[in-house]
Amino acid sequence: MRAITGDRALDSIFFGGGTPSLMPPAVVDRIMTAVRRGWVCGEDIEVTLEANPSSVEAGRFSRFVQAGVNRFSIGVQALNDPDLRRIGRLHTAREALSAIETAKKYADRVSFDLIYARQDQSRLAWHAELSQALALAPDHLSLYQLTIEDGTVFGRRHQAGKLPRLPDADLSADLYETTQDLCESAGLPAYEISNHARPSRESRHNLIYWRCGDYVGIGPGAHGRLTVGGKRRATHAVSAPNDWLRGVETGRADHEQATVLSAEDQAAEYLMMALRLREGVVLSRLHALSGREPPEHALGGLLEDGLIWRTDDRFGTTPRGRMVLNAVLRELL
């Protein structure tokens, strides 16, 4: 991989997918040693590790920091035990609160996530829960509105009748507005549809995705995007862990596939990602990736409807537009 990427410096490392906090910290230490041996790493590199808030995993936080981790992203999802059980989480609310405090003790940067628009959730209940989360003084929050999609865990649970009494569209919109208002007032404005941060505390790693930057995906089933020789490629490693490991150990190239992205693919990908961001689409970036401009008639209609804003060098979605992002994208693609 080092031979392909060349002398590029690393800005971010992200241990995610599955439950990386189950790894022994010594494994993280060996990975970080190998990374520093192969690439240039800046002094302010962001090293994030996703973690569950169980007491066992939280007990490893100090050793993860010693291994080089400087940011934790904790999968909390709810701050009360009944809802945690409803969504199938094994930790308790007390463990979640303890894990957040432990992470803040050792790491400079801590994020955690919550899911809202859950069963029987009222606007008042969400206001109280989010206020409790903000009182923990995080510098970053990921707040995901529960959506039901086919093929997902929640989709299967919904089809099986295990998610009754979900909020309707009007209440879901009210919950979204409550989220934006509370976080803005607390100094954590939304920089992306579901992500809120204090200034300069945004997730640098996720911004690379949303800005369509280059990133290397390592591990079974990992995806990546790499620009080599002026061509942007989508990479995908084989999903079976044993097959992936054999490919790495034997140096076989077929354990990872790479597809050159067309100009149309790059335009669609950038629009889908950048319109999630408050900063919006940079027109020069869109042109550099795909050689195309957005359709003027579509921009005009969306602007008139109050779904986008526009300046000389960029455009983006308004809060209303982000609520109906799929409709905005249909007009532009």
Regions found by a protein language model. Give the residues of each.
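Charged substrate- and nucleic-acid-binding regions of tRNA-handling and nucleotidyl-transfer enzymes
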Residues: V281-L283, H297-G300, R310
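Short amphipathic alpha-helical interaction segments
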Residues: S290-E304
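Minor-groove-contacting beta-hairpin "wing" of winged helix-turn-helix DNA-binding domains
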Residues: R314-P319
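Short, amphipathic alpha-helical interaction segments positioned at domain boundaries
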Residues: R320-L333
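A short, conserved structural fragment
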Residues: L303-D313
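C-terminal scaffold of the Radical SAM
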Residues: M1-S290
